[in-house]
Amino acid sequence: MLLIPAIDLKEGRCVRLKQGLMEEATVFSDSPADTALHWFEQGARRLHLVDLNGAFAGVPQNLPAIKDILAAVAKDIPVQLGGGMRDLKTIGQYLDLGLNDVIIGTAAVKNPDLVREACKAFPGRIIVGLDAKDGMAAIDGWATVTGHHVIDLAKRFEDDGVNSIIYTDIGRDGMMSGVNIDATVKLAQSVRIPVIASGGLTGLDDIRALCAAEKHGVAGAITGRAIYEGSIDFAQAQQLADSLD
C-alpha cells in the first residue's frame, strides 16, 4: 500500500483546507519545496500536489512553487499534480515540466472526452480525480455538487487507459474523522481501475483498514492534515503499510 503525502498549494504556500473551503486554510509552510524534500526524506515514494487556486480558476496558478518542488525531488520520486487541468495544452505543458502524472478532476466530469484524448496523447500518465459529497461528484474546487454518482462516472473511464482514480470524500477531507472505507471499497469493486483513497486519514487504524481493502482494488492513500499535525508519523505509517502488504 502506497502512502502519498499531499502538498496543497495556495498563493505559493503549502496549506491544508477543511472540506475544501479556501477560507478554512491553515498555512503549514512558506516553502513547498522544503516540504517536498521533508516528505522524501521521511520515505515518501510519490508526492501529490494540488494547485488549489488552479482548481477554482480553471488554470494552474502556482507555477513557481511547482517548479521549485520538481527541482527539489522529481529526480528521485514521481510527482503528480491536480488543479486546473482542463485542456490538452495545459496538461502537456505541465507534464513537460517533469511531472510524472496529472490529475483531471472537474474536466473529467464536464468533458469525459478530454480524459480519452489525454490518455491517448499521454499514455499511462493520466489520473482521474473524483471528489464526492454523499456519493455525488463535486466540481470546480468542490464549489458545485453535481447530480452524477461517482461510480457511474468512474465506469465511463474504464476503457480509456486511465492510470488510476483518486477518490476523495469531501465530508472527511481535512476533518480527521477517518477514511470512508466503505465508499472507497464500493468504488474500487465497481471498476477495473486502481483506486487511491483520499480524505480523512487519521491514524494507523486507517492504514490497517486500507491495507485490508487492497484486495478489492484500493491501491494507495493520500494523506494530508494527519501528517502535518503529527497524528500520523509518515515514516512509521509507510513502514506499517509495507509490512501489511
UniProtKB/Swiss-Prot annotation:
Enzyme Commission designation: 5.3.1.16
Keywords per UniProt: Amino-acid biosynthesis, Cytoplasm, Histidine biosynthesis, Isomerase
Cystine connections: none
InterPro entries reported for this sequence: Aldolase_TIM (IPR013785), His_biosynth (IPR006062), HisA_bact_arch (IPR006063), Isoase_HisA-like (IPR044524), Isoase_HisA-like_bact (IPR023016), RibuloseP-bd_barrel (IPR011060)
Name this polypeptide is given: 1-(5-phosphoribosyl)-5-[(5-phosphoribosylamino)methylideneamino] imidazole-4-carboxamide isomerase
Major site of localization recorded for this protein: cytoplasm
Gene that this sequence comes from: hisA
Record-annotated active site: D8 (proton acceptor), D131 (proton donor)
Enzyme class (EC, first level): isomerase
GO BP: L-histidine biosynthetic process; L-tryptophan biosynthetic process
Catalytic reaction annotation: 1-(5-phospho-beta-D-ribosyl)-5-[(5-phospho-beta-D-ribosylamino)methylideneamino]imidazole-4-carboxamide = 5-[(5-phospho-1-deoxy-D-ribulos-1-ylimino)methylamino]-1-(5-phospho-beta-D-ribosyl)imidazole-4-carboxamide
Organism name: Neisseria gonorrhoeae (strain ATCC 700825 / FA 1090)
Family of the protein in this entry: Belongs to the HisA/HisF family.
Entry's Gene Ontology cellular component terms: cytoplasm
Signal peptide residues on this chain, from the entry's feature table: none
Localization per Swiss-Prot or TrEMBL: Cytoplasm
